[in-house]
Structures are given as structure tokens and as C-alpha cells.
Amino acid sequence: MRAICIERPGSMSIIDVPVPVPGSGEVAVTIAYVGYCGSDLTSYRGLNPLISYPRVPGHEISGRIAALGPSVTGLTVGESVTVLPYFNCGKCNACRMGRPNACKHNQTMGVQREGAMTPTVVVPAEKIIPVSGVAARDLALIEPLAVGFHAVRRAGLETGETVVVLGCGVIGLGVTLGAVRRGARVIAVDLAAGKLAVARALGAAETIDASTTDVAAEVRRLTGDDGPQVVIEAVGADVTFRQAIELVGSCGRVVYVGYAKAPVTYDTKQFLLKEMEVRGSRGSERRDFEEVIAHLKAHPDVGAHVISKVVPFEEAGPAMAAWDADPGGFVKIVVALEATNA
């Protein structure tokens, strides 16, 4: 069978790979759609320190169960599923604490191990999440939105609080959805007007175009002297890492869900004077997936707002090149593999 492969930075191709067969405790999944993640873009650009080449990308998965390996129960061939794409060790202190998403030895599909940009994948049965009542295309949104929902949970965001969301890519939009779901007021910030329009459609109370507006002054105008209780950084840039601690109000919480690609310097007195809390947020957990699924069932229009483009398998490479050339022009690109499986 064929697979999309990032051969080296800036180069993608279609390669032949063996058809996998499920072993004991494993499930074969026929892939319907796969979303391109920001980590796939950084891998394409040669900026992802976690990847080795060549690599089949893809961990935002929509599919159907094709076959069950021996000893698998509770699942049915043909049912729609998404996949928890993180493989934790089960032994490190994070795993023992019940926080497998923070596993020291985690391997994510499409990053440290081969991904899902291929007609069939085989995964352990415990990684399968059956989903009904959500469009097949939109199943590919569950994983990235869950990363945003997890960041909201890490923030401990409460009803009535104000959160500034730095970045309106799909992770930032997941933060926006998760925050609105909790009854918070969202102020979304981005450089791209189109992404800000999506944030408003998903419930952001206010948006700030950082390309034309003094973000600090506008946040101050919108929140007064108190400032926001929470700032969630979903860009992964040194400027927004610093901006997060500058914007948050006294005794507030900063959550980093992006990570800067270079060391960041801070005016460290801000940490003390504001007595702020700074928290990291990594990936997501099954309960975050389940919350996103519930939200998509209740709000079936989310996919229409978030997905910018659906491309066939053969155009996956050119689509990545287009995203690389104009990252602000797309929120989410989804690759359709259904025709490939026909």
C-alpha cells in the first residue's frame, strides 16, 4: 500500500509500505481522513527536534475498524473511530501518577513512530475510541481540539473568568472552544484576520489583530487594571512566551501549550511581583477526547468553521508546501484517504 512520507526537510513523496496485520490485542483501522498538525509542518521545515527522517506523518485520525486481532473484545468491525496517537511507557513517574500524556518516553504517531497518512494502520485496542454521531471528516479534529481542551483543564479555568488565547491555529481554537464551554470570556489574539473570524464564530467574545493593534494596550482596555485571570499561549514563539507573562493579571495563571523553538529570555521579576502560576500542557488524555466528542455532537458546525481545505491523498505533498508558504492562510488542512481505500 502507499503512504505519504516526509523524506527530509522540504521534501515529501508517496512511498510503498507493507500492509499491516493486527496481532493479539491490536486493531486494524482503515483511514478515512487525517489532519495536518503544526508538528507535521515543523517536521517538514526541519524544525521538529523529536523527529527522525524519513517519517510517515499524521496523528489526527478518522477511520473505521477493518479487523480485530486475537483477544480483542468490545469493538466491532466497521464502526467509526478515532485513535489516541500517544504511546506511553507505563513505567515512568508521570505514567505512575496517572498522567500518561506527560510520559518521559512518549512516542507519538507521525513524530517518533510512523503515522497514519496511509490507508491502514494497526494500533493497540486500548488506543481506539469509537465515535458515533460525528461526521467522518470531523473525527480528524478530535485530537487537536483535545489538546486545546487539555490546556483549558490545566489552567483550571472557571465560569466568569477571562482568558487571553494567544494564537488561533487549531490548538488555540480548541482552547477557545474549551474555555467557552466552561463559561469563560475569551479574548483571542492572532496575526491572521481569517483565523480571528473563526475564533469569533466559535464563541470568542473579543478578538485582537496583533498585526495592526498594540496587544497589551488592547488587553488592558478590555480587562481594566486587573488584567485577565488566565493567558494560554498556543503559538510557540519567543515573543508570545514573553507576552503571556506580561499580559496576565496579578495572581493569574499562564499555560504554555506551544513550545518555543529557541531559548526564551524573561524579565523574571514579573513572576514574583505578580505571584503568577506558570503551567505546561502536553498533548491530551482520553477524557479530553471524550469532552471534544460531546462538544462536536452538540455543535456539528464546528468542522465547517475550522477545516480550511480537504485534499485528496495525491495532493498531500503540494498541500503541505502551500501551508508552508502561507501558514496564516489555513487553519486546518485535512487529507482524504477514502478514495485511496476504494
Per-segment meaning from a language model:
Residues 134-212, 217:
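Mid-domain Rossmann-like dinucleotide-binding core that forms the NAD(H)/NADP(H) cofactor-binding site
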Residues 66, 187, 255:
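Conserved beta-strand positions in the Rossmann-like core of class I SAM-dependent methyltransferases
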Residues 242-246, 286-342:
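C-terminal hydrophobic helical "lid"/dimerization subdomain
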Residues 47, 192, 260, 284:
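Residues in the short beta-alpha loop(s) of Rossmann-like NAD(P)-binding domains
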Residues 155, 197, 202-277, 317, ...:
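Glycine-rich cofactor phosphate-binding loops and adjacent beta1-alpha1 units
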Residues 20-34, 47-93, 132-134:
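Glycine-rich beta-strand-centered segment in the early N-terminal region that forms part
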Residues 60, 79-80, 94, 120, ...:
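Residue-level marker of beta-strand positions
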Residues 89-166:
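NAD(P)H dinucleotide-binding glycine-rich loop of Rossmann-like/cofactor-binding domains
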